[in-house]
Swiss-Prot record:
<comment type="function">
    <text>Transcription factor involved in abscisic acid-mediated stomatal closure. Regulates the expression of NCED1, a gene involved in the biosynthesis of abscisic acid (ABA). Required for the stomatal closure induced by the bacterial pathogen Pseudomonas syringae pv tomato DC3000, but not for stomatal reopening.</text>
</comment>
<keyword id="KW-0805">Transcription regulation</keyword>
<feature type="domain" description="NAC">
    <location>
        <begin position="14"/>
        <end position="163"/>
    </location>
</feature>
<dbReference type="InterPro" id="IPR036093">
    <property type="entry name" value="NAC_dom_sf"/>
</dbReference>
<dbReference type="InterPro" id="IPR003441">
    <property type="entry name" value="NAC-dom"/>
</dbReference>
<dbReference type="Pfam" id="PF02365">
    <property type="entry name" value="NAM"/>
</dbReference>
<feature type="compositionally biased region" description="Low complexity">
    <location>
        <begin position="177"/>
        <end position="191"/>
    </location>
</feature>
<keyword id="KW-0539">Nucleus</keyword>
<keyword id="KW-0804">Transcription</keyword>
<feature type="region of interest" description="Disordered">
    <location>
        <begin position="169"/>
        <end position="194"/>
    </location>
</feature>
<dbReference type="GO" id="GO:0005634">
    <property type="term" value="C:nucleus"/>
</dbReference>
<protein>
    <recommendedName>
        <fullName>NAC domain-containing protein JA2</fullName>
    </recommendedName>
</protein>
<dbReference type="GO" id="GO:0006355">
    <property type="term" value="P:regulation of DNA-templated transcription"/>
</dbReference>
<dbReference type="GO" id="GO:0003677">
    <property type="term" value="F:DNA binding"/>
</dbReference>
<feature type="DNA-binding region">
    <location>
        <begin position="111"/>
        <end position="169"/>
    </location>
</feature>
<keyword id="KW-0238">DNA-binding</keyword>
Length: 349
């Protein structure tokens, strides 16, 4: 009988949901440097394998630990006996470098380089590109051992994963499932939605005059007028219907003010309609003595304005005498000479 392999998580009694998601600096300093120095790890999270002997889709079964990403310590062989280029042939294809190398630092000190590679099936340079990606971490030249062997590096650290290119991309690329990253919090989705709401443009004031918003404002006004001390909580729970707040339930002061505003608007509209009817019923004759008729019409309009000003000013003459005197006593220090404008307050006797 074979010996049953133990799960690394069970060996350390780690709780469910544990994920191995180290940073680039941690992979180089805490794992690769220690591996090159001959350090033994108490928990074998990263397996040891020559990954250039296998196709990438076989590597997950060779890994010690991992769900979506798999980590390996692997040696690198030289492409030529005395050269410094690595041999990238692996399995039924080859690994091809892509992008630019990234220098990894720790406490302001350069410790290693991160390189991205893509696996191609077939022979270079006419291979077929796949979705398998490798991130290769290696130490700097000064930190590597050169003993004249065929191996370019004793150990490099590699992260293998398959890029998922099928299916539509998610709406928010910043969201990740808990199976991919261990440090993702449960509040990441809510923060993304808050950012989306904050990015929406603010509504202009013209939208506040929409009928639906006006009805909502009226309902809010009616709810605010309810006395909280006498409010029946059964209404809030939906056990009783909400009482209608019509004109009979409104306060006398509010009802009187509302009726006054309506009467004023109706009276003003009637005056405007009467004026328009008179104009259309008696249009001016422009073919005869146009100049004389225009002068007469202007005199009638000016006479009507003067009468209206006299009627309104007589009602508030006592209140406006002090204001008028204080206004006329002011000296125009800047020489602007603003024209005197008649104050039309819109009150009727």
């Amino acid at each position: 009988m074979g010996v049953q392999e133990k799960d690394p998580l069970l060996q350390l009694s780690l709780p469910p949901g544990f994920r191995f998601y180290p940073t680039d600096e941690e992979l180089l300093v805490q794992y690769l440097c220690k591996k090159v120095a001959g350090h033994d790890f108490p928990l074998q999270i990263i397996g040891e394998i020559d990954l250039y002997k296998f196709d990438p889709w076989v590597l997950p079964s060779k890994a010690t630990f991992g769900e979506k990403e798999w980590y390996f310590f692997s040696p690198r062989d030289r492409k030529y006996p005395n050269g410094s280029r690595p041999n990238r042939v692996a399995g039924s294809g080859y690994w091809k470098a892509t992008g630019t190398d990234k220098v990894i630092t720790s406490q302001g000190r350069k410790v290693g380089i991160k390189k991205a590679l893509v696996f191609y099936v077939g022979k270079a340079p006419k291979g077929s590109k796949t979705n398998w990606i490798m991130h290769e971490y290696r130490l700097f030249e000064s930190s590597r051992k050169n003993n004249g062997s065929s191996k370019l590096d004793e150990w490099v650290l590699c992260r293998i994963y398959k890029k998922n290119s099928s299916g539509p991309k998610p709406l928010m690329s910043g969201l990740h499932s808990s199976n991919e990253y261990s440090h993702g919090s449960s509040t990441s989705s809510s923060s993304q939605f808050d950012d989306m709401l904050e990015s929406l443009p603010e509504m202009d004031d013209r939208f506040s005059n929409l009928p639906r918003l006006n009805s909502l404002k009226a309902e809010k006004f009616n709810l605010d007028r309810l006395d909280s001390a006498n409010f029946d909580w059964a209404i809030l729970a939906g056990l009783k219907p909400m009482p209608e707040l019509g004109p009979a339930n409104q306060a006398p002061g509010v009802q009187g003010q509302a009726q006054g505003h309506v009467n004023n608007h109706i009276h003003s509209d009637n005056n405007n309609m009467n004026f328009l009817n008179d104009v259309y019923a008696h249009p001016p004759n422009f073919r005869g003595n146009t100049k004389v008729e225009s002068i007469n019409l202007d005199e009638e309009v000016e006479s009507g304005k003067r009468n209206q000003r006299i009627d309104q000013s007589s009602y508030f003459q006592q209140s406006l005498n002090g204001f008028s005197q204080a206004y006329t006593n002011n000296v125009d220090q800047f020489g602007i000479q603003c024209p005197n404008q008649t104050l039309n307050l819109g009150f009727k006797q």
